[in-house]
Amino acid sequence: MWKDLPQNVPRIPRIQVPAAAADNSLLKDLNQGQRCYLYSIMRIYDSRPQWKALQTRYIHSLGYQQHLGYITQQEALSCAAVLRHSTMRASATVAPQRTILPRVFSHAKKGQPAKPGFRVGSRASLHSMLSTKTLDKA
């Protein structure tokens, strides 16, 4: 009978409950349908896609700032490494710790701008962009 249905009818994807959620003692008394419903709600509120978009936007921003000469290639690579390290650590632990920025970005640094003759008004905007709030998972 189900074979007689037209092929253009969309199918509802099966929602699989992850083992981590299924083994939770609070979910033990729920039946399979209730767990699937709860997990579908969990997927709606999942912040991972937003987190990935933020990371992508941050990497593009680093490249653009390097292109404009606000930061050097070494600084951009250092920031990308901090982001990668922070992401790996955040995914490995339940409560991520604060990330310490590389020495390159200390306020005491009095170096030359990336392009000769090009002065940046303030490095405070760069520091605010690199604050640990944007690097650690909220």
UniProtKB/Swiss-Prot annotation:
InterPro entries associated with the record: FAM216
A Pfam cross-reference name: FAM216B
Family: Belongs to the FAM216 family.
Protein name stated in the entry: Protein FAM216B
Organism lineage string: Eukaryota, Metazoa, Chordata, Craniata, Vertebrata
Gene from which this protein is expressed: Fam216b
